[in-house]
């Protein structure tokens, strides 16, 4: 069915891919991305594990409406999370050779 050594080679390839994916997942968890809103007036630094490390607010916003500032912080967090997701997809595509995952399935499994 798999030919000479086909099943063994397939298992070896799967193991190698799994090892590469584990390395990439560790790399992703350590990376940091900066999300911005309000043309850079609010910046949020987030890790690949979606932990917020830092929030920077331009002093000019401290005099403005509290609700607007809250909205800008939320938008910056969402921007950072979106950037992390895009980066994860790119890195995982490199490991899987562009192999698409079934809809709704995320990495890590």
From Swiss-Prot:
Entry annotated with the keyword DNA-binding: yes
Main location: cytoplasm
Presence of keyword Cytoplasm: yes
One Pfam family, short name: YbaB_DNA_bd
Cellular component, GO, one term: bacterial nucleoid
Family: Belongs to the YbaB/EbfC family.
Subunit structure of this chain's protein: Homodimer.
Protein name (database record): Nucleoid-associated protein Sbal223_1770
């Amino acid at each position: 069915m798999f030919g000479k050594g086909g099943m063994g080679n397939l298992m070896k390839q799967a193991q190698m891919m799994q090892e590469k994916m584990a390395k990439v997942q560790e790399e992703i968890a350590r990376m940091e991305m900066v999300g911005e809103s309000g043309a850079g007036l609010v910046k949020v630094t987030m890790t690949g594990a979606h932990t917020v490390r830092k929030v920077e607010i331009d002093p000019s916003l401290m005099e403005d409406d509290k609700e607007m500032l809250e909205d800008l912080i939320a938008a910056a967090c969402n921007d950072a999370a979106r950037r992390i997701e895009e980066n994860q997809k790119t890195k995982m595509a490199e490991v899987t050779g562009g192999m698409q995952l079934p809809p709704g399935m995320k990495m890590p499994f």
